[in-house]
């Protein structure tokens, strides 16, 4: 075995200029792993706690408490542990925190250490991270769900839906799929500029124009897909993030108040008109009856993804499976706090034929851990923003590297 010999953390910046935690783990052979923890803007209420300082520094968003928890509390407990026993490490982190949502240490502290330790162990074996975490069966390049028009909490515009994505499923390689997205993205920029719209970018690298309603972005994407020559090879996916505009039992958007039934019918109409393959968080995280109805209505036709609904939590997902809510789960490691817990949620989903989508957060960094993680777990899909901004392209570029070693692209088999 190789023992964990040193652990340290410090404050760095994410893509929004907010502080986040960077952790480094050193093993007894000198191998080092490092990781930067992401941060979300629209968050589910049941997510693991992201510990912030709430003082005068950085408008209260500093993470020195989480950093201190790594350096002072966590380090002393995990030094000497077997670096190759990820489960033991992560279970130790959970026990040390003592809460279900990491409200003592902070999930930004525990996840940083968990990720960094996995990287150090992979480095010690001379293995790529995806192979170390996934073993011999880690081979499938995921279909990217590329968010090229931003709205909601990710943009300063008047569009309610949070993400308008394109999914290049009709290709035999990841690099060709990515090329199609690049070409569509370039055409979209020209279309927006020519029509007098802003080409400013949102948090995730997509364009963030003011548009008439939540349908106009879809029309724009369809125009660009057609001009690029990729009809029937690229579909549309939406992240509605409806919890953000759910209040007093109604969904408030486009200057109207919609019931769950109204919104479901809106989705049915959209799916009949456009090649929509996936809707994420179509209803609010606590609108359970609505979710059951939505799944009954569209669950056999498209992918219905639970993000705020499930928050990458194995126990919550299990309840959702029993109640037949959604048919897919978004996977965000920082929602749950460790690598092991993330893997358990993915395995539960896969055993029950729920699809998985590995996902970034809107506050990201140059760390490309989730690219390897998506391949390791054969999630088959990944969300990591538009093809702009370095914190987004870092993940795409890492997947292009992985494709040189493992060239199976899920594509039409999705």
UniProtKB/Swiss-Prot annotation:
The active site is at 204 (proton donor), 332 (proton acceptor). Binds a second Mg(2+) ion via substrate during catalysis. This is Enolase. It comes from the Bacteria. GO terms for molecular function: magnesium ion binding; phosphopyruvate hydratase activity. One of its GO terms (biological process) is glycolytic process. Its cofactor is Mg(2+). HAMAP family: Enolase. SUPFAM superfamilies: Enolase C-terminal domain-like, Enolase N-terminal domain-like. GO terms for cellular component: cell surface; extracellular region; phosphopyruvate hydratase complex. It comes from Campylobacter jejuni subsp. doylei (strain ATCC BAA-1458 / RM4099 / 269.97). It catalyses: (2R)-2-phosphoglycerate = phosphoenolpyruvate + H2O. Keywords: Cytoplasm, Glycolysis, Lyase, Magnesium, Metal-binding, Secreted. Its EC number is 4.2.1.11. The keyword Coiled coil does not apply. Mg(2+) binds at residues 239, 280, 307. It is found in: Cytoplasm; Secreted; Cell surface. Pfam families: Enolase_C, Enolase_N.
């Amino acid at each position: 075995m190789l023992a964990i010999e040193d652990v340290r953390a410090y404050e760095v910046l994410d893509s929004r200029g907010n502080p986040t935690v960077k952790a480094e783990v050193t093993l007894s052979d000198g191998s080092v792993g490092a990781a930067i923890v992401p941060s979300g803007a629209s968050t589910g209420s049941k997510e693991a706690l992201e510990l912030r300082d709430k003082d005068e520094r950085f408008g209260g968003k500093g993470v020195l408490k989480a950093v201190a928890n790594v350096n002072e509390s966590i380090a002393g407990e995990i030094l000497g542990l077997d670096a190759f026993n990820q489960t033991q490490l992560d279970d130790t982190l959970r026990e040390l925190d003592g809460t279900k949502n990491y409200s003592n240490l902070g999930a930004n502290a525990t996840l940083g250490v968990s990720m960094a330790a996995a990287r150090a162990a992979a480095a010690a074996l001379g293995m790529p991270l995806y192979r170390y975490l996934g073993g011999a069966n880690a081979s499938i390049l995921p279909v990217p769900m590329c968010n090229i028009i931003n709205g909601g909490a990710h943009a300063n515009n008047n569009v309610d839906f949070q993400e308008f994505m394109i999914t290049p499923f009709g290709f035999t390689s990841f690099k060709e799929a990515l090329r199609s997205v690049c070409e569509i993205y370039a055409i979209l920029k020209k279309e927006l500029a020519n029509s007098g719209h802003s080409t400013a970018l949102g948090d995730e690298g997509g364009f963030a124009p003011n548009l008439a309603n939540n349908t106009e972005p879809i029309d724009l994407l369809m125009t660009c897909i057609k001009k690029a020559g990729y009809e029937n090879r690229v579909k549309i996916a939406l992240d509605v993030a409806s919890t953000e505009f759910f209040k007093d039992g109604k969904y408030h958007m486009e200057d109207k108040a919609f019931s769950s039934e109204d919104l479901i019918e809106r989705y049915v109409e959209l799916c009949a008109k456009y090649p929509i393959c996936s809707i994420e968080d179509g209803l609010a995280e606590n609108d359970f009856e609505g979710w059951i109805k939505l799944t009954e209505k569209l669950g056999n036709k498209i992918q219905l993804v639970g993000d705020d609904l499930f928050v990458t939590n194995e126990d919550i997902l299990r309840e959702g499976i029993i109640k037949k809510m959604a048919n897919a789960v978004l996977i965000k490691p920082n929602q749950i706090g460790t690598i092991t817990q993330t893997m358990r949620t993915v395995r539960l989903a896969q055993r029950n034929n729920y699809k998985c989508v590995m996902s970034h957060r809107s506050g990201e960094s140059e760390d490309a851990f989730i690219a390897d993680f998506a391949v390791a777990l054969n999630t088959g899909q990944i969300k990591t923003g538009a093809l702009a901004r370095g914190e987004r392209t870092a993940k795409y570029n890492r997947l292009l590297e992985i494709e040189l070693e493992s060239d199976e692209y899920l594509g039409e088999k999705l």
